[in-house]
């Protein structure tokens, strides 16, 4: 296990295009690093406060580059994040929850299509397929960029209309092993987007309810971080130790469950999956969706 280099996150961030008063944190490498094959790519985050977050991982990337002659170290095109990249007054506090849900269903998000923007935590990698959540942090232009950059992979755009704040996929749609996914019951994948899963005998089951009614203090995520588990292999999963319902469900689904106390870290950026990024894998790239059908999610 390697750890990022601490940075001074409370200092202002400034570029020729914007200024913001502080950074974010280095707790969630899942948001920044995307591993595909022998390549680790730094993301093109849409939050201005995360513009220089990749610097926390720069020493590790440089180390991997020097140690492994086959390692590819890349950076996605950096977005400028000018005012044109966002819809103004999108987060007006006078907008009701019902209106937010209507926006999500209509795929009306704060980001525009001026430039590709994406967080790595919006990308669910399943062998030869990339399922990318279209939401507040990743736009459709980013998916088109992925399609061109990885022509040998299939890129799918998915969205979850029940989520009023769709940011990242790991508390919504989580693969546990080939053929099995747990889905947030409040944010179900629409029926028309399930065709590719059904054609390849994947089972999508509702996730167990969270054990808590409210998030811990200062946490900006929902109680559904209960789903934000770390899958070690096809039989082993780490779950936050207080999430008794989720652990019970994992056990019934045939997983070996490792409870990990982690709730106190939620305020710094997320759950167990958020706090990790895999940098080394064994085996080849499998095709878990060989049966291709008329798929509305395909980019």
Where are the regions that the model predicts?
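The feature marks the mature, well-folded catalytic cores of soluble enzymes
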Residues: 1-299
